Regions:
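Structural transition elements
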Residues: 254-296, 315-319
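N-terminal lobe/hinge region of extracytoplasmic solute-binding protein
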Residues: 1-9, 130
Length: 406
């Protein structure tokens, strides 16, 4: 999209030249103003974007003040010098700026005229979506189980696009997905559980790491879960090894940390996981230690029992893991009752973002190849910090790391 980039000596001013042949799928030119409008829209607290925190992660000038409503969006450090020149001002040099630009939809441009013409219906159907990439949406409804893309002839690299289109089917049942694959309705399908064992010797079968972390997020505003010993007891009383080998059986590996192996390396080629090591044992499976922590926590709360609801989405894998956790917790922690609440992913996320849940089973995948993609989720006020964890020292450490002060 940009044909050139210039960086000032202090690394605080970045100037991008937009390609002259960059066009929207309706034929309108892509301009620098499209980026200014889009970034301001993400930063605007009224938009309530899930990825608003990316604006601050990128160290864009005045990002924190704009996203918190202390300053107007017009003061965000992004402007159009002319139709094809985008100027970005940073509050401090950002080592991962290029990663961020290439990773998140929040930094893509938006055609302001088109967005405003759609009103509240923007991005709810194929007719209210506009593309500037190799494909455009030809069929999509919010409740549909299929999204169809076709080649975008207005794309500046259209001659290099070899596919006429791509079709995505949203299938929550693994058996149904596998049957569709066998019938020739799908070219690629993700397998889990017993289906992995069924297909692992098939020449069409292959494995790869998707970098996603499945994790539990307790709502720290809920009674009982606001107690650190109760949370530690929950963390230590289920067997992650058993989840990967007996429940999922899909090549997943257990982790006692959040930044996975293979995500990023330093200038010496050392993997972050090796450099960071493991500083805590709170997540290590140890039933006897968990029982002691549980007993201590109940005593501090003045209770002899607790009841929580575990929320998960309606996929086979998520439900199987949730059922395993329910069994482990109730068997290992006397006086604990766990109810399961199964919801479609969209509904689950809405409840978790509003803080209307007890314990959530959710997942997170890396947006860019740097540990910060996992670490700044937990800063105070982050839209992905469902647990409402808040620690001033942690916030300060993350902020220093972003600026390169550590």
């Amino acid at each position: 999209m940009a044909e050139s980039e210039e960086k000032s000596e202090d690394g605080l001013t970045l100037t991008f030249k937009i390609r002259d042949d960059a066009k929207w799928s309706n034929g309108d030119p892509v301009t620098a103003n499209d980026f200014v409008y889009a970034w301001r829209r993400v930063a605007d607290p009224a938009t309530a974007s899930d990825y608003q925190f990316f604006i601050t992660t990128a160290c864009i000038a005045n990002a924190e003040e704009v996203t918190t409503g202390e300053k107007p969006v017009e003061e965000l450090g992004v402007e159009a010098a002319d139709d094809k020149t985008l100027v970005v001002t940073l509050s401090s040099p950002c080592a991962i700026f290029d990663y961020l630009m290439a990773s998140g939809a929040c930094f893509l441009p938006l055609n302001q005229k088109f967005v405003e013409s759609c009103g509240g219906n923007f991005a709810t159907s194929a007719d209210t979506l506009l593309a500037d990439g190799p494909f455009k949406v030809s069929s999509y409804e919010p409740s549909a189980m299929k999204v169809e893309l076709v080649k975008n002839d207005q794309f500046f690299g259209a001659s290099d696009v070899k596919l006429d289109g791509v079709e995505f089917s949203i299938i929550t049942d693994s058996q149904t997905a596998a049957l569709s694959f066998e019938n020739g309705d799908l070219d690629i399908v993700t397998l889990s559980g017993n289906l992995v064992e069924q297909y692992e010797d098939d020449p069409r079968f292959s494995t790869r790491s998707d970098g996603y972390n499945w994790y539990l997020t307790p709502n720290m505003k809920k009674e009982g879960l606001d107690n650190v010993n109760i949370r530690k007891a929950l963390a230590k009383s289920y067997d992650k090894e058993a989840i990967t080998t007996r429940v999922l059986k899909d090549g997943s590996t257990p982790m006692d940390y959040f930044v996975p192996q293979g995500l990023a390396t330093n200038e010496k080629g050392e993997d972050f996981r090796e450099a960071a090591g493991s500083a805590y044992d709170s997540w290590t499976y140890d039933v006897e230690a968990a029982k002691e922590l549980w007993k201590t926590g109940l005593g501090e709360l003045g209770k002899d029992s607790l009841s929580f609801t575990l929320m998960c989405e309606d996929t086979d894998s998520a439900q199987a893991v949730a059922q395993f956790l329910q069994s482990e917790w109730q068997n290992n922690l006397p006086g604990l009752t766990i109810e399961l609440q199964v919801l479609p992913k969209k509904a689950r996320l809405e409840y978790m973002q509003k803080g209307e849940y007890d314990i959530g089973l959710t997942r997170w995948g890396p947006d860019y190849a740097d540990p910060m993609t996992d670490l700044d989720m937990w800063i105070t006020g982050s839209s992905t910090n469902y647990s409402q964890f808040s620690d001033a020292d942690y916030d300060a450490t993350i902020q220093s790391a972003k600026k390169g002060d550590l």
